[in-house]
Structures are given as C-alpha cells and as structure tokens.
Amino acid sequence: MNDDQWVAGISKKDAGRYSRQLLVDDFGVSGQKNLKNLNVLIVGAGGLGCPVATYLGAAGIGTIGIVDYDHISLDNLHRQVAYKEDQVGKSKAQALADNIKLQNSDLNVQVHNTSLDSSNAMQLFKNYEIVCDCTDNVATRYLINDVCVLLNIPLVSGSALRWDGQLSVYHYGSDCPCYRCLFPSPPDPNSVTNCNEGGVLGPIVGVIGSMQALEVMKIAAKVRTTLAGQLLLFDGREGKSRTIRLRKRDPKCEVCGDNPTITAPIDYVLFCGAGAHDKIENLKLLELSDRVNVTEYRNKRREQKPVLLDTRPSLEFEIAHLPEAINVTLKECRSLSAEDISNRLGLQNTEHSDVFVICHRGNDSQRAVLLLREKLVDIKFRDIIGGYEQWALKINDMFPLY
C-alpha cells in the first residue's frame, strides 16, 4: 500500500478548522458537508441576527444571506455585539457581512441592504434553504412566514423582550404548524411592544440567537430533535427555560392549509394595521390646540414654573427628567381617581389651570391627555409634541436620549 494514499471524508483544511464539531455525535462529517452546501437567509441584522450570523459563519455555512436596511446606532451596541463603535452609522447588513468574513474568509455572504416587503420577498427567499426570522415587528413576521410556506422553506423564528425570549421552528415536516396556524389574526397594534419601547437585555438576544443558529445546524445535519412543532420559552430573570408542544398544522390555515387562500404575498401593513418596521410611529390623537411643541413649553417654563406630568414608567423617569416633572405613569392615569391625580400634581394648592403632559416620544402623553381631561374637566391638559426626544434634539442636546 502507498503511504501517500488515504480516504478523505473531508478536506484537511476543513478537518482542522471544524474538528471539534466533527467529533460530535449525530453531526460529524455528513453534518459538516451539509452545512457547507447550505444557503441560509437571515432576516434582520440586529440583536438576534448578530449571534445567528456569527455562529453560523463560524460553523462553516456555505452561503449566508443577510437582509436589513437599517444602520448601526450607538444604542444598538449593548445587544448587537457583532458591531463596534467605529461602525456606528454604517449599514448593518454590510457591517455584519464584513465582520463574519473576518472570522471565516471561506464564507460566501450575500448582502441584501434593502427593506423586505411583499414585492421582493419571493425573489430574495427563493435561493435559500432555511430562513431565520430575526425581526422585531408583526407585519414582517407574517410576511416571512407566508413566503417560507409558499416556497416550502423551514423557518427558524426567534424573539426577545425585556428578560424573556422565545424560539420555534415553523413549517418543517408535514404536521408542523406555520406561524399563521397559531396566530391567524394579528394582534391589536396598540397591544404590541417591541424592544424600542419595552427594552431588552443583551444576553437574552444572545441566548435566543445562539439557539436559532443551533436549530439551523440541527436541520442541516438532519438531527431529529429540532424545535419543530414546539415553542421554547426562556426566562432570563429566573434562569429557567421550558418547552411547550404546539398544536399541529391547521388544515384550515389560509397559507399552509389543505385549501389555501393566500397563494402570494399580501399587503401586510394593511393586514396588521402597523408598519413593517420596529420604529415607533408618531401618533396624532389630539387636535393641535391640545398640543404644544418643545420650544413653546420652554418659553412657558421661563415665564413661570408650570405643572408638568410625566407619564413614563418609573424606570424611564429615573434615567432623566425635567426638574419640575411629576411622575404619574400612564397606567396610573387610567387607574387613579381624579382626586388622587389632583393631589399628586398639587392642583388643590395652586391656581394653575393648565397641566402639560410629557412622555418619551409624545404618544403616551397624548393617550394620557385623553384620559385626564375626562377625569379633571376643569383643567386644560396639553401634550408636549415629541416628548423628551424632541427636547433633547431641539432644546438641550445634553439631555439623555435612549
């Protein structure tokens, strides 16, 4: 026998690079080969997308596509750990692609620096075999789900908020439900909270994103114990997780059922009643006569100390507030009696007939005005347009933005 001959299951380079995962039961050489031939699309290059892309890139996925239209901002860095300070302002999709290529130069990374919508999703998805939903809004979740079903692509979906995270695999196997099977109708837009409003801890998205990457690797390696048909719930505060079994595919589902009525992407903004993005939309609930801008309020407070009601949760109030602000949260505006609110604001000991109402961005303050003027009919409540965000942008640039 010739000493220079051997049977190679994998190249010397790949054996050296991926040796530790080649030694894992149920993964091995076949799993690594499957990874190398796999095309995975990551939708969203934020807190979830960063660990998904980082771990899949390191694991040796053949092609990774990244879809995101947004740019890196300073308040991303605590949870979007693939980015650095000197990348603030740059394209997330491009920066994430560049960073994972630095870790593994063999990767083929496709950058889709665009907003995903009904007009381009089918074209974007058709060249990929697994999709990871790393987004943070309901409309895009329905869009991603429907397109994955229409193209018969497994969907690995994660979400995270505050201390908690969730993870599931949809449309993978004949009995596995899709997202629409479980949620045929979207939630009320006013009941939905994303991390821009509710906050999230960085390690939470790190855990969920890492597990999304793991599910992709399990699907690629054909490991039978995936989260298809199950929902993993992670409680970071308690350090606990549990898995619940989901109901099976709904034969009456509009997109994956026996007689589907959705055979192409629809208008998801119309369907959900909310935009397909995670930005906070500025509401217009009040007439202009019931509102003042931050410049007008600044002029008022220079004349005399006004009564200022701050509707933000106490955690946000602690970050920063104007000296005259009195913290009565939106929840308290709903629950407290007129007398209690009057006492909190000190209205019984003052001749003030005007009360100004402020919040983070000017949405909750409008909701509060609608509530308060029903309870205290003799008081003129006025919302401050744009809230503290506009105060920081136009009046005092040292006021903390968050």
UniProtKB/Swiss-Prot annotation:
Record CDD domains: RHOD_ThiF, ThiF_MoeB_HesA_family
Gene that encodes it: moc-3
EC number: 2.7.7.80, 2.8.1.11
Protein source organism: Caenorhabditis elegans
Enzymatic class: transferase
Cofactors named for this entry: Zn(2+)
Binding site for ATP: 47, 68, 75-79, 92, 136-137
Cofactor binding note of this UniProt entry: Binds 1 zinc ion per subunit.
GO molecular function: ATP binding; metal ion binding; molybdopterin-synthase adenylyltransferase activity; molybdopterin-synthase sulfurtransferase activity; nucleotidyltransferase activity; thiosulfate-cyanide sulfurtransferase activity; URM1 activating enzyme activity
GO BP term, pick one: protein urmylation
Stated name of the protein: Adenylyltransferase and sulfurtransferase MOCS3
Record family assignment: In the N-terminal section; belongs to the HesA/MoeB/ThiF family. UBA4 subfamily.
